């Protein structure tokens, strides 16, 4: 039963006085504000707008907001907007385990999963900390057994390969984190299967040895269609290799689920079942048992450091005044561009190959959370909400879509991420210095641009001149970490989680449900039964009928 408390006393963000004040500021100065001029006017601009986060282990991440299209007055009004939207009240409700996901009547408590200080955290009057810690201890024991070689397959061989079968949050998080922290891996290989396309599971199984492979089936309900279909194919492959002996399944399959009945029916020993509660949303689940593949890959101590890095950002988000609250500032800038500059997209470009899946992970976090059009006041929003988030690692991205960022007609606010220290400082750190020079240069170029006079001074004439002009004044946030460690990665993810939270709180939407994924699933079941027959289909619109019937002819 959904809670009636929508955690806001306004229906639309446009009702808030600060929203109207920001609209006036945009017209008066925002749309004409030139960042280059702002730097010239204020020698302390960088010191004022750059914020340093100190992690639990003393490592630092610098967030430079100074190249954004704001001044002191605009920033003050954005902070006032956060106050009027009661962002901190909603934040506190989340951290207190209240059911802020009101359409499903659930708490939003992924923050409890990284509570390594083990302080009491309650949902419905129950302290969930002991249960969360018990699952982590179970993960630790299992991880150490597998990594040490003590866990044996049915022929007595140790595990060499782990295959995580999941989809959505049960896949995107573990894939991204294992790639990002590959430097910390030892000899265990991890593979991920998510797509229902048979190619994904077939290509993954092709080179694996069934005697040394461990499968993790990641599905809270153990009924997710794509995941259970892929898991069943994996089980059939395993049985085809071992002579069909079902008793061996328990040595090669574990479940990340809470449905003991279905897990047991599948053949998995429930001792190897790792659960998590319904207050853990899929896109926030990498901190839970869903992160078991990560712990197996990098070791439990590193996984715990990953949790602690996120916990440190949680502490910052809760305790830091709004003016210096790094995730809150990131979220407010996003609202400023989306709603007042009509920016429809947001670029995240990591200047780090290990982070090559980070933008894909953030796509789900941002777009599934804030791709909503109805507010907590149960009315349709009369303003834009979630941005289209995209990105690729740089410098590759510079040779593909950066042209659009520099000279296109759309304003695309961008986040650039770099670690100062490389895990691979080859050629006397030459590669890292080239990478860093591009990180700094791209942000500077987007800000300063190049005017006609400069273009002409470089020898361009006539009709070529306008083609070589860069308007500049394109906003960027530069995020500079010391090194990509488990703690740093945990902190970066938590930063973007709380940015997303802040956006949703301002827009007064529920960032924690995802009804938009349901309709397609329902229709897919109907069409699935139609594909099982040879009959010509005529029950849909002519386009869908035509496509289905052509598919049936060609299959």
UniProtKB/Swiss-Prot annotation:
Organism: Kluyveromyces lactis (strain ATCC 8585 / CBS 2359 / DSM 70799 / NBRC 1267 / NRRL Y-1140 / WM37) (Yeast)
InterPro entries: G6P_Isomerase, G6P_Isomerase_C, Phosphoglucose_isomerase_CS, SIS_dom_sf, SIS_PGI_1, SIS_PGI_2
Keyword 4Fe-4S included in the entry's annotation: no
GO biological process: gluconeogenesis; glucose 6-phosphate metabolic process; glycolytic process
PROSITE patterns: P_GLUCOSE_ISOMERASE_1, P_GLUCOSE_ISOMERASE_2, P_GLUCOSE_ISOMERASE_3
Residues the record lists as binding D-glucose 6-phosphate: 169-170, 219-224, 364, 368, 399, 521
Keywords, comma-separated and alphabetical: Cytoplasm, Gluconeogenesis, Glycolysis, Isomerase
Catalytic reactions on record: alpha-D-glucose 6-phosphate = beta-D-fructose 6-phosphate
Family to which the UniProt record says this protein belongs: Belongs to the GPI family.
GO cellular component: cytosol
Pathway(s) of this molecule: Carbohydrate degradation; glycolysis; D-glyceraldehyde 3-phosphate and glycerone phosphate from D-glucose: step 2/4
Subcellular localization: Cytoplasm, Cytosol
EC number of the protein: 5.3.1.9
Name of this protein: Glucose-6-phosphate isomerase
